[in-house]
Amino acid sequence: MKLITAIVRPEKLEAIREGLEAYGVQGLTVSAARGYGRQRGYTEVYRGAEYNVDLLPKIRVEVLATNEQADDILDVIIASSNTGRAGDGKVWTMDVSEAVRVRTGERGVAAI
């Protein structure tokens, strides 16, 4: 099993969710994140004072997948979140040794 994690622009969440739903993903976790990559941040002037905004708002999307589904899900997330501009985000996968559905006690792929 794989845990696919994406840190992407907040405005891309709906496109990602729709793409994953169309692929057949039944669940995902979304949380707020802040950070920067190559684009760093920006300077904003508010009421005459300069402010450095160096941690930009992002979202973190996590999906558990079978090994067979992982590459396809990765492709769906990339296609749904790509704008071609700096700040589009990152996507990575990690091996998961065990998953358990708390309600039923199902383990492994059955818990996904």
Model-derived regions, located:
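Positively charged, small/polar-rich N-terminal and surface patches that mediate targeting and assembly
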Residues: 1-112
